[in-house]
Swiss-Prot record:
It is found in: Cell inner membrane. Na(+) is not transported, but it plays an essential structural role and its presence is essential for fluoride channel function. Fluoride-specific ion channel. Important for reducing fluoride concentration in the cell, thus reducing its toxicity. InterPro entries: FluC. Its main location: membrane. GO terms for biological process: cellular detoxification of fluoride. GO terms for molecular function: fluoride channel activity; metal ion binding. Belongs to the fluoride channel Fluc/FEX (TC 1.A.43) family. This is Fluoride-specific ion channel FluC. The gene is fluC. NCBIfam families: PRK14195.1 (NF010791).
Amino acid sequence: MKMILAVAAGGGLGAVARYLTGVGLGHWLGTAYPWATMTVNVTGSFAMGVLAGLGAHVWQPAPELRAFLMVGVLGGFTTFSSFSLDVALLVERGAIGAAAAYVAASFLLSVGGLFAGLALIRTAVA
């Protein structure tokens, strides 16, 4: 039961952070392009890389804390379901080039963010 509560609490925090990121970036950059979704996926992937790197090298958190952060907070913060919807909306608006660029940039930057997080921790603990 502790594990479920940890994931639920983290998921709530992550979802609120995602929402606030969307509101903030929407005001700053506009909503014609899905900047908020790409931002949460890239930064969330970077954070996942940092946490995974820490867990592999220097930090052994309790299973509940690990689940709270990685499954809950980051699971609620990042979102590929919204990513898929954003792609579909761009395609349906006829913005095929923007949709393709969004898919490529999101994938490359998210995976790159994870590797950057891992590299940061590997360098810091070396």
